[in-house]
């Protein structure tokens, strides 16, 4: 691991986001394994929410798929790794900030990602999202 990856790992341990991710993974009955770059991969998540195919809580990346499919998708892993770094910077308040940004994006764009700065920073396409650049809310109506 690089020094930055070790720092992220330590920050997410100290800010309790990785322990929360491990608790969530355990309660959901996932299988965990050591992943690359200090990440922990949890596979077999079958709860209804969130709907995403993968999501991060601290250094824990939780997938719906099995371990082979999870590790084979390096683009999605990179996207979730960027969320892991966001947790390292913001700690547990990241959860509330993320959901507020997703709600704002849903209101403005009709989806939780296009206007969400956390998803945009992590890479919309890498996370399986498409960009809807035209906000629904605040559009001007042209009179005829």
Describe the function of each predicted region.
Residues 2-51, 56, 90, 94-144:
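Metalloprotease/metallohydrolase-associated module, dominated by Zn2+-dependent proteases
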Residues 75-87:
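Active-site recognition of the HExxH zinc-binding catalytic motif
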Residues 66, 86-90:
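Active-site-proximal flexible loops/turns
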Residues 68, 80-81, 119, 125:
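Glutamate identity and glutamate-enriched acidic tracts
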Residues 51-54, 61-77:
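Short pre-active-site segment immediately N-terminal to the catalytic Zn-binding motif
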